[in-house]
Amino acid sequence: TTLFRSSLFGIQYPIIQGGMVWCSGWRLASAVSNAGGLGLLGAGSMHPETLREHIRKCRAATDRPFGVNIPLMYPQIEEIMAIVAEEGVKIVFTSAGNPKAWTGWLHERGIIVAHVVSSSRFAVKCEEAGVDAVVAEGFEAGGHNGREETTTFCLIPAVRNATTLPLIAAGGIGTGEGIFAAMVLGAEGVQIGTRFALTDESSASPVFKEYCLSLGEGDTKLLLKKLAPTRLVRNNFRDAVEKAEDSGASAEELRTLLGRGRAKKGIFEGDLEEGELEIGQVSAIVSRQQS
């Protein structure tokens, strides 16, 4: 933990709150940072100017370090990166893309870069790209996942053996015991999504939170593998996806079924039947909403 406290993120505890779409706004990120962890804003569901507003509000609410999570496949990536630099953000977590694309640019502006990977092969690519830390995420995680379907328990030692980069474990971690287990396996810190998505400060719909707190084992499933493998909660939309996949739907047909704004509809607006409900397997052991 010394590494996280002193040289890397300047935080008190080696706990990072995942920058999740529709959950990770300034209220959540600043609360986590104020508590001694690292809060991340989820740029994936924000228009560029919305992100600017959240960065400013987060900075007003905390004097501790915080960062921004940016999926590299974001359509207005240049605008988002420019805003992050203009607003003086010092920590960026990137995912869903090649870390080579932006790491150098971010480093030139004095920004620390961590990249999310789902395999040791990608972790090696991160090291080659010059990132400062790697987040190894097992497929227990909610939302988008890697194609390898490797569990966190198997992924952490594999990544630890493949790279000397500071290693952050993610996927299926939601308790103190889970954090300890990740560190025993070789991680220096953890990134937690689900547990923070279901807090008071999360910007997700109260209806979505309440529903996810009632889930048990087996209530989430990895689907949409022809597009980007995504862990989804059972509902009408997921049933339709499963039916389409079972009948051999093409990537194009699945894209049409997915449409636009499906995750917003589910997570932010609380449409439990037609929305895309993304949450991790660890939701099965989270039963109450906390601050």
Task: State the predicted function of each range.
Residues 6-61, 268:
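Conserved N-terminal beta1-alpha1 strand-loop-helix module at the mouth
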Residues 16, 40-42, 67-69, 91-94, ...:
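Short catalytic-loop micro-motif centered on adjacent basic/acidic residues
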Residues 43, 47-50, 94, 287, ...:
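Catalytic cores of large soluble enzymes that bind and process phosphate-bearing ligands
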